[in-house]
């Protein structure tokens, strides 16, 4: 039933289906010019957009369900708030996987991409990514009262996520100030984790920082969302309770400070981007370069 309700949500369909495919063909056909190696390089950012779409789609869906009284119907059943939120995440995950699979299929059939790196790492990064960004969407839905408020807050969060993380513009191409800010964003770790897994075939133990940071953040945001969850549109949460939502920024605030000192992701993303540019200059066949140094 949760899957059927999710499919009725236009926001979810746009951000988790239509937008990812639009970016896929834009990146693969225009930016990569159909070159298989370049398409493979861009698959990480493209798939990350599909994964992050669960944030916008789920927050909008939950607020809509609350305004329309659908959550009230669930409330009279033995379903707990944790059950409701968990089922929402599972529904988004089940519906996001076909989008990711189709993007990989199109890359193979249309653009001739051979091999997609370490698929186990890709699946794990997609899984923790969907759970973490969907949980953030649940937090937004819990602290906003109307769809208008939800859309405003989503925009404020969404724009930095897609423009400063490497999802739409390579991190190596961003100004240094934007790069320094980007490492505070969870999307940056999702984008690089997927790109490292697909382009460099990185096993999951080489992506421990990206995977564990997203997993820890998912647990925290889900817990906060469960504490703030409301079944009724008339229910309000105290203003001081919203500080729980602000606490969800703490993990990546600390990780961003550390990363700005270490510079690991910035160096690796620059090396990856330069390797693709070097390949273009030498006009060699679509061989995948050796991975950068292990973390």
Where are these regions (language model features)?
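Short hydrophobic, aromatic-rich alpha-helical segments embedded in or entering the lipid bilayer
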Residues: 1, 169-211
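Alpha-helical transmembrane segments of multipass membrane proteins
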Residues: 2, 25, 104-109, 127, ...
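Transmembrane helix-boundary elements of multi-pass transport/secretion proteins
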Residues: 2-71, 82, 88-96, 100, ...
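Hydrophobic alpha-helical transmembrane segments of integral membrane proteins
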Residues: 13-17, 156-157, 163-166, 182-183, ...
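Small-residue-enriched core segments of transmembrane alpha-helices in multipass membrane transport
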Residues: 43-46, 51, 122-135, 155-163, ...
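Hydrophobic alpha-helical transmembrane segments of polytopic membrane proteins
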Residues: 121-144, 165, 216-225
